[in-house]
């Protein structure tokens, strides 16, 4: 059972070290997920506020006198750009979250396969 295995870093780990790495790895997953979700929530809030500004700017373009149309259109364009940027940031963070969760899932599956191959009845403690 104390057989030495090679990790993905090409360093040799004992079963105890591998088990410790497994626990450390699973402890870090929620932190990354929490971080990404926090950023997604933040960007979504900014996006929602900017959409309100966008709606206000659109009403302003419709209701303003002809002499103020160019400046109102500029405000509308700026608001549209900002709104799109927050949407893009939210999407990028969601993609990062997906990639992190997928990579973590694959890594976790590799660790579980190793543990099950060594002891087929092994069930990790909750």
Curated annotation (Swiss-Prot):
Subcellular localization: Cytoplasm; Nucleus
Domain of life: Eukaryota
Sorted UniProt keywords: Chromatin regulator, Cytoplasm, DNA damage, Nucleus
Record's keyword annotation contains rRNA processing: no
Extent of the signal sequence: none
Principal cellular location given in the protein's record: cytoplasm
Any one GO biological process: chromatin remodeling
Single GO cellular component term: cytosol
Function: Component of the mst2 complex which is a highly specific H3 lysine 14 (H3K14) acetyltransferase that functions together with gcn5 to regulate global levels of H3K14 acetylation (H3K14ac), critical for DNA damage checkpoint activation.
Assembly and binders: Component of the mst2 complex composed of at least eaf6, mst2, nto1, pdp3, ptf1, ptf2 and tfg3.
Name listed for the protein in its UniProt record: Pdp3-interacting factor 2
Protein's gene: ptf2
